[in-house]
Structures are given as C-alpha cells and as structure tokens.
C-alpha cells in the first residue's frame, strides 16, 4: 500500500525543502510518507536522481535503487540516525525503487540498500550513475505511488 499523507497523530516538526524533494525551487522528487511515518523521496529522472542523492540526502539517510538496471533513486530521510530501516519502511521504499525502474513490470526483484554516505559519484559518471562503497541487497515487489499525489 502506498500512502502520501502524514501519519495520523504523528509529530511533524515541519518539512524542510529537502524533506519536500525541492532543490533551488525545483521539485526533483516525489514525496511520500512510509507506513512508519518516515519521509521517502523518489527521484524523477537521471538528473534529478543526482541532485536527490548528492545534494538533498544526508549521509545518514537511507538510499535504495533497483539492483539490475536503470531506475529512480529512493531516499528515506533519517533525522533520528537509525542504524536500520523499520521493516515496513524498508518494504515500502524498496517497492518504490523497484516500481520506478526497468523492473516495474516484473515480479520480486533485487534492490540495493545503503546509507547515502556510502553512495558516491565518481567524476565522469553519467547522470544518475553512482558507485556504492557498502550496501545490502533486499528483495521487493514493485509498487508505484498514486500519480495525483506526486
């Protein structure tokens, strides 16, 4: 299930531009809220993926991407510095990474999960291409957000 509203009864200290997926006045990511109440940002294209990962993501945020092909970068904001994603948020974010990728029409697929601080972009890499220092692989069923809420 994909939700895009704030969790009921959850404390919201107020969004920052980064929490809204906005860079220099331009929306570069879809903003969703996971079942556990965490902000999830989904890149819209290769150039926006670069901005999302390199400019908006904090090193302690979680980063996800389908393992085998092109797709959106997904960033889960982590202001509390959690060491692991809550299970439902991981399932939600990994599903979005698979759903906004070349694997969107397939079944369960592998998704890389890393801390954003372990994601780098070497000089000369094409837009959207990155290199991972450390990551784990999780399996996910593709899902997409309702377009009206993007």
Question: What do the PLM-derived regions correspond to, one by one?
Answer:
Residues 2-150:
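Duplex nucleic acid-engaging cores and interfaces of nucleic-acid transaction enzymes
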């Amino acid at each position: 299930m994909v939700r895009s509203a704030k969790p009921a009864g959850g404390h919201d200290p107020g969004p920052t531009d980064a929490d809204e997926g906005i860079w220099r006045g331009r929306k570069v990511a879809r903003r969703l809220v996971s079942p556990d109440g965490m902000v999830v940002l989904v890149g819209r294209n290769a150039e926006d993926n670069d901005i999302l990962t390199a400019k908006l993501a904090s090193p302690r945020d979680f980063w996800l991407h389908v393992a085998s092909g092109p797709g959106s970068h997904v960033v889960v904001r982590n202001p509390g510095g959690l060491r692991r994603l809550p299970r439902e948020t991981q399932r939600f974010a990994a599903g979005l990474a698979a759903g906004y990728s070349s694997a969107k029409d397939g079944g369960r697929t592998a998704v890389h999960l890393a801390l954003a601080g372990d994601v780098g972009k070497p000089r000369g890499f094409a837009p959207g291409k990155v290199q991972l220092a450390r990551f784990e692989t999780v399996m996910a069923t593709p899902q997409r957000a309702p377009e009206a809420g993007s």
